[in-house]
Amino acid sequence: MTLAEEKQVQRKAGITARRALAPETRAAANAALCARLAALPCFRQARTILLYAAFGGEADLATLAETARGLGKTLAYPVCGENFSLTAAVPGEDGWEAGAYGIRTPILSRAEILPPEALDLIFVPCTAFD
């Protein structure tokens, strides 16, 4: 099996395991993760944070986003474009739409766009980790 094939098998297994979690287990894990991330010095020091809108069983950082907003931090979310480009967008209250695959995505025309150097901390989703 090639490395690419091994990665695909691991990815599929990770997604399957993640989706099999009971709702209460998932909620407890999300709460614990958000609390742990909020306690990190890099989170406390960051003024502008790039988060993601959870999709398909990804770790849900909504509680972390609420904490960050309460601390006056600026929250940006990624918008994927052509050729794997990524835009950091700060959406307004009515600045969301269902993007590719139904993923909650900021509407660029209603968002403040931030340059990469404005981001102090970036959270990205992953399939699985140990």
Task: Indicate residue ranges for each PLM-predicted region.
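N-terminal active-site beta-alpha-beta segment that forms phosphate/nucleotide-binding
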Residues: 2-118
